[in-house]
Structure formats: C-alpha cells, structure tokens
Regions:
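Flexible loop/turn connectors
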Residues: 88-89, 110-205
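Alpha-helix capping/helix-boundary segments
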Residues: 8-9, 69, 76, 125-127
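Short hydrophobic segments within beta-strands
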Residues: 4, 26, 64, 120-121, ...
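Alpha-helical recognition/docking segments in bacterial nutrient-uptake
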Residues: 1-51, 109-115
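Active-site rim loops that border cofactor/substrate pockets in soluble metabolic enzymes
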Residues: 88-112
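Alpha-helical structural signal in soluble globular domains
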Residues: 15, 19, 75-86, 101, ...
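An alpha-beta-alpha
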Residues: 47-87, 92, 190-204
C-alpha cells in the first residue's frame, strides 16, 4: 500500500501493517515500525526560497502554510524561519489549506504588513489563491513563491516561481521501497529524501 497524502489517518497504515501488508508513505511522517517513507527535501526547498529573497534584498517577508500539524508545512516553515533570521517574517497558518485559504490569508497578511516585499506559500494552491486574492483587493502584489510546481503554476495569469518536486523520483523510490518490503517484511523502517529545485518565473524573478 502506498499512501500519498496527509488525508488518510495513520490508523489506516497501522491497520495494514498489523496484517503484514507493506506500507510506504510519500511526503508524510510517521514513526511506525516497518513503515517506509519517501519525502521531498522540504528543508532544502525552503532554504532555496529564503536564499532567493536574500539575493533580491527582500527583508520584509511573509509565510503562508497549511495547519501547523501538517508535516510538509511544518518542515518548510521551520527551515524558512531558520534561514531568514535577518528578515522580518510574518506568518499565517490555515486550517483548511488550498486556494481559498491562500486567497484570504494573503489579503489579511498584506493588509497588516503593507510594506511586505515577498511571500512564501507552503503549496502552489495557497500561492495561486494569494495572487488572486491580492489582485482582487487591488493590494500591492509582493513577490510570491509556491512549492510543488503543479501544472497551473505555469499558467499565464500566474507564472508562479515555485519549488519543484521530482514526482517521478518520489514514485520510483516509493515503488522500490514497497517491492523490497514485500520481499522482506521484517526489514527496519527506511526513509529516503528526494532533492528539489527552484523554478523561477515572473511572480518572483
């Protein structure tokens, strides 16, 4: 069984493992004996964004993430904060996540911080919502960076600078871990990290 999102409860993985059905998680954390994980390097991605902000001289910046319990959001936020100690960072966490959450959070964040120069969103959907929310409010549009590189990120109205996940390599490692686990269920838990890269587009040059 490969679990690819944060939505299914961990109890589902525990149930499969109890039946000795191999489980591999993608971009999710769990300390479960015999459960393998493969994740994008969230910390590397956040550092790439922070370094971009630093090179551009942006010092008043923001972060929008999903809820604090979300594994990927937490890793991206912590690495970003650690890398931006010389910047003023304002943050928002959204219970729902997704486009509408980004739409509302960006409007609130920029209204409270009118001099904001750049905004890092923990997912592309948050970032796309942020762009539209600020445009609709006729608010100043800071540089905006997302994370994922979903197809919509390259759409003309957005041209979103983002951190690209290597989905092909994530899938390759997930299948490899699963097949090995099928052959040897008693192996210790294993974890692999997949590098990411920054894709520069118009939203944050």
């Amino acid at each position: 069984m490969i679990i690819t999102s944060g939505a299914p409860p961990l109890s589902l993985a525990e149930e499969y493992l109890a039946r000795k059905i191999p489980v591999t998680l993608i971009n999710r954390h769990a300390d479960l004996a015999g459960c393998d994980r493969v994740c994008s390097d969230n910390a590397q991605g956040a550092k790439l964004v922070a370094d971009l902000f630093s090179r551009r001289g942006w010092r008043q910046v923001g972060f929008i993430g999903e809820n604090r319990e979300n594994f990927s959001t937490r890793q991206r936020y912590e690495a970003f904060i650690a890398r931006t100690s010389d910047m003023a960072v304002s943050s928002r966490f959204c219970d729902g996540g997704g486009y509408q959450a980004g739409y509302q959070a960006a409007r609130e964040l920029v209204a409270e911080n009118p001099g904001m120069q750049a905004l890092f969103c923990a997912t592309d959907m948050l970032a796309l919502g942020a762009q539209d929310g600020l445009r609709d409010a006729a608010a100043p549009l800071p540089a905006i960076v997302g994370f994922d590189d979903i197809p919509q990120a390259d759409w003309q109205p957005y041209q979103l600078t983002t951190v690209q996940q290597n989905t092909a390599l994530l899938a390759h490692h997930a299948v490899d871990l699963l097949m090995t686990r099928i052959a040897r269920f008693s192996l210790p838990s294993r974890h692999r990290e997949v590098p990411v890269k920054l894709i520069i587009r118009h939203s944050a040059k």
